[in-house]
């Protein structure tokens, strides 16, 4: 699309209030899906992240890497096993996971950011005992659930002018590595950092009223509307853990959480810097009586529906 000079000026002017609003604010980005595989989409995401830094925001990137891990397991002739959609992670699988996430995926993201003129550094949750975890389920092996996050290391990296890129690997009670769901890392990290926004880059347009019609996109959801959307089947299957992640972040102080289609070029910029935005935005809302459900009530709601159509792989 070719824009006239006046149209280009209009686009820049439209973005100005948002640049002011998010200047010097932390934005946590969960980077996954097709945008990690397609070279054009990779470059689009990286340029979005770099531009965010140049206009004064502080992007923090948490990445996935499920397809790359699966491919590497095949190279080592090791079968991928799943329980309720979660990858069973024995010691050998954990070592391969670390090799892929830290040695390949994270380094590629860091290199691409550096090549675009902004300094970046790659770390994982074990560095500085940043993300502490415990085993989620003995049947899953070294799959971890987050118990605490120490943000000092990330804040230091941000203060030095770097973009932190974080691999979803946690530190267990005995110092062992745990494979963590990247959505969970992003959501809890956003809350711990006091981020202004959480952005989940996915392979869907957002929450759809009709799963087969992207025109049915729901652009704005309040937290008090989530239960009804789950009960009526609008939010289901693979969308439930993402909504759960967004809810957890918003309930703990993050102003807005977004589910964004990473298959579309520059989708993050469109969400942040335009009036219309893209994807689905989740913001805080009380229940019908003006009160918020407590976290235990919400966890019960999410867990009740979570594995009806299990999909999510830890660390993805």
Curated annotation (Swiss-Prot):
InterPro entries: AceGlu_kinase-like_sf (IPR036393), AcgluKinase_fam (IPR004662), ArgB (IPR037528), Asp/Glu/Uridylate_kinase (IPR001048), Glu/AcGlu_kinase (IPR001057), NAGK-C (IPR041727)
Catalyses which reaction(s): N-acetyl-L-glutamate + ATP = N-acetyl-L-glutamyl 5-phosphate + ADP
Alphabetical list of SUPFAM superfamilies matching this protein: Carbamate kinase-like (SSF53633)
Keyword Transport attached: no
Pathway stated in the Swiss-Prot or TrEMBL entry: Amino-acid biosynthesis; L-arginine biosynthesis; N(2)-acetyl-L-ornithine from L-glutamate: step 2/4
A cellular-component GO term for this protein: cytoplasm
This protein's UniProt keywords: Amino-acid biosynthesis, Arginine biosynthesis, ATP-binding, Cytoplasm, Kinase, Nucleotide-binding, Transferase
Broad class of enzyme this protein falls into: transferase
Listed NCBIfam families: argB
Entry binding sites for substrate: 65-66, 87, 179
This protein's record includes keyword Protein biosynthesis: no
Record organism: Alkaliphilus metalliredigens (strain QYMF)
The enzyme's E.C. designation: 2.7.2.8
UniProt similarity note: Belongs to the acetylglutamate kinase family. ArgB subfamily.
Entry function: Catalyzes the ATP-dependent phosphorylation of N-acetyl-L-glutamate.
Protein name: Acetylglutamate kinase
Chief subcellular location: cytoplasm
Subcellular location: Cytoplasm
Domain of life: Bacteria
Annotated site location: Transition state stabilizer: 30, 242
Record GO biological process: arginine biosynthetic process via ornithine; L-arginine biosynthetic process
Phylogenetic classification of the source organism: Bacteria, Bacillati, Bacillota, Clostridia, Peptostreptococcales
GO molecular-function terms, A-Z: acetylglutamate kinase activity; ATP binding
């Amino acid at each position: 699309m070719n824009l006239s000079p006046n149209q280009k000026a209009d686009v820049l002017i439209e973005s100005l209030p948002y640049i002011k609003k998010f200047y010097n604010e932390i934005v946590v980005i969960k980077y996954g899906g097709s945008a990690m595989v397609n070279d054009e989409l990779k470059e689009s995401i990286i340029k979005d992240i770099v531009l965010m830094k140049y206009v004064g925001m502080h992007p923090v990137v948490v990445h996935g890497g499920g397809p790359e891990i699966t491919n590497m397991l095949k190279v080592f002739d090791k079968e991928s096993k799943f329980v309720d959609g979660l990858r069973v992670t024995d010691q050998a699988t954990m070592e391969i996971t670390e090799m892929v996430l830290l040695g390949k995926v994270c380094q590629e993201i860091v290199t691409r950011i550096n090549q675009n003129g902004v300094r970046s550094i790659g770390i994982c949750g074990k560095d500085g005992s940043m993300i502490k975890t415990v085993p989620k389920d003995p049947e899953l092996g070294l799959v971890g659930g987050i118990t605490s996050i120490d943000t000092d290391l990330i804040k230091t990296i941000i203060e030095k002018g770097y973009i932190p890129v974080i691999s979803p690997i946690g530190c267990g009670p005995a110092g062992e590595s745990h494979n963590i769901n990247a959505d969970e890392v992003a959501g809890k990290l956003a809350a711990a950092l006091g981020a202004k926004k959480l952005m989940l880059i996915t392979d869907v347009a957002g929450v759809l009223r009709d799963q087969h019609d992207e025109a049915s996109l729901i652009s704005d959801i309040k937290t008090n509307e989530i239960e009804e959307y789950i009960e009526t089947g609008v939010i289901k299957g693979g969308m439930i853990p993402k909504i759960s992640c967004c809810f957890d972040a918003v309930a703990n102080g993050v102003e807005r959480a977004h589910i964004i289609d990473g298959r579309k070029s520059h989708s993050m910029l469109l969400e942040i810097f335009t009036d219309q935005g893209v994807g689905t935005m989740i913001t805080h809302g009380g229940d019908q009586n003006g009160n918020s459900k407590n976290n235990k009530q919400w966890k019960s709601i999410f867990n009740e529906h979570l594995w009806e159509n299990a999909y999510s792989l830890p660390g993805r």
